[in-house]
């Protein structure tokens, strides 16, 4: 800018009653006053993914102790910070009407960019007990504000070791799995989902041939390996720990159709017993 005398300007004056006159006007330039900050300028925080326009700038400009009214705005309010944390941005101060002797002013201020929140959903399908360790089939989805990939990790304890693999479970029951979802410039999202292993439905299919040496009693010792069960379409054996037996006896059919204990030697006897499931991993159908 140039301040002081910058030259002259000739001005021709024409009227109806007088001769034309030529005036010489001396031109003097004076720079506008640039106001300065009175104290600090502040900006309200924004969230990653938002533009600077969301943030409000607060400050005061002065000139020789006198407040200069005007407005603060971002030099480029459409700017979107590329990361969370402290971000340096330029502001522009425009003097208000009535303060034309003042020039616009610019400067930088640190604006806090907070991590954005993730939108996540985790669901697990239920399973039936198989006797083996199982991993639940899950659907985990995560959405970040800038399409950054979301990484999921899992643990069977809230403060446990989180890994990319879903914990395995064996016995029937309901289990809580903890997850963390993370993406750059976003707050980690945590939560839980339930893994359910349902008891395996079974029905008695057959009993193996059983024999004993005559001892004068119809009582029989029965073990789980003598029984075959049907589960869905598969034939299975249950471990001894899954069943308990009571009142197991050889019986014979009477003339009236009833069955009575039969301790005598002979073949073709019926077997009568009561069995009780002692494992929560199975359930009788029907």
Explain the meaning of each model-derived region.
Residues 1-286:
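Short loop/turn motifs that initiate or flank beta-strands
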């Amino acid at each position: 800018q140039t301040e002081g005398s910058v030259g002259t300007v000739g001005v021709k004056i024409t009227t109806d009653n007088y001769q034309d006159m030529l005036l010489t006007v001396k031109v003097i330039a004076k720079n506008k006053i640039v106001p300065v900050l009175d104290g600090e300028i502040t900006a309200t925080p924004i969230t990653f993914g938002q533009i600077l326009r969301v943030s409000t700038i607060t400050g005061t400009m002065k000139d020789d102790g006198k407040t200069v009214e005007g407005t603060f705005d971002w030099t480029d309010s459409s700017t979107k910070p590329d990361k969370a944390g402290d971000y340096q941005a330029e502001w522009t101060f425009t003097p208000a009407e009535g303060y034309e002797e003042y020039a616009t002013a610019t400067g930088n201020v640190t604006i806090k960019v907070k991590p954005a929140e993730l939108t996540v959903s985790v669901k697990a399908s239920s399973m039936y007990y198989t006797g083996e360790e199982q991993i639940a089939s899950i659907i985990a989805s995560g959405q970040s504000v800038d399409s950054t990939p979301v990484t999921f990790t899992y643990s069977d304890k809230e403060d446990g070791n989180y890994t990319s693999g879903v914990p395995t479970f064996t016995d029937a029951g309901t289990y809580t799995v903890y997850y963390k979802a993370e993406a750059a410039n976003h707050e980690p999202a945590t939560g839980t989902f339930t893994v359910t292993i349902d008891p395996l439905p079974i029905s008695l299919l057959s009993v193996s041939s059983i024999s004993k040496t005559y001892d004068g009693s119809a009582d029989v010792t029965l073990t789980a390996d003598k029984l075959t069960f049907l589960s869905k379409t598969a034939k299975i054996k249950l471990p001894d720990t899954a069943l308990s037996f009571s009142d197991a006896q050889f019986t014979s059919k009477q003339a009236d159709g009833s069955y009575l204990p039969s301790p005598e030697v002979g073949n073709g006897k019926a077997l009568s017993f009561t069995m009780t499931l002692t494992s929560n991993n199975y359930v009788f159908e029907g």
